[in-house]
Design a protein with these regions (language model features):
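Terminal leader/tail segments of proteins
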Residues: 1-133
Length: 133
């Protein structure tokens, strides 16, 4: 079954190992084989990463889109998730869910679950900031 992907004008996406950018008009694509697909809104650039959960998301993104270096990215992911759960045990259930998806090679779903991890981190950081003020 093909994946239907709609790109807005100027929107980028990763399809397989290629970064594509749409032209002036909305376009509908059908991806007919099993390759990583990420929309621009789901892509995190290394220079934009600043928090532990963002680093975990980036490691997962690389696990998904860079299969040639997957063992290295998985090791980075392991180290980052260990550090996070030691520092903040409240993240353990979300991290365990993500790692279970990774173990099942469900990398896209793990990436989506990592969005929840990032949201939880943002909420905690917001609460800390509000408490200080």
């Amino acid at each position: 079954m093909a994946l239907r992907l709609t790109l807005k004008p100027g929107e980028r996406a990763i399809i397989g190992e290629a970064v594509v950018r749409n032209g002036r008009n909305r376009v509908h694509l059908l991806v007919e084989n099993e390759v990583p697909v990420l929309r621009e809104s789901d892509i995190v650039l290394p220079k934009a990463v600043g928090t532990p959960c963002e680093r975990i998301y980036l490691a997962l993104q690389l696990v998904y889109v860079d299969p040639g270096k997957r063992p290295e990215h998985l090791e980075t992911l392991r180290v980052l998730t260990d550090e996070l759960t030691q520092a903040a045990p409240s993240f353990r259930p979300l991290v365990d869910q993500i790692l279970a998806l990774v173990a099942g090679k469900r990398f896209y779903q793990a990436l989506k679950s990592a969005q929840t991890l990032r949201e939880h981190e943002r909420e905690l950081l917001t609460r800390c900031t509000e408490t200080r003020n």
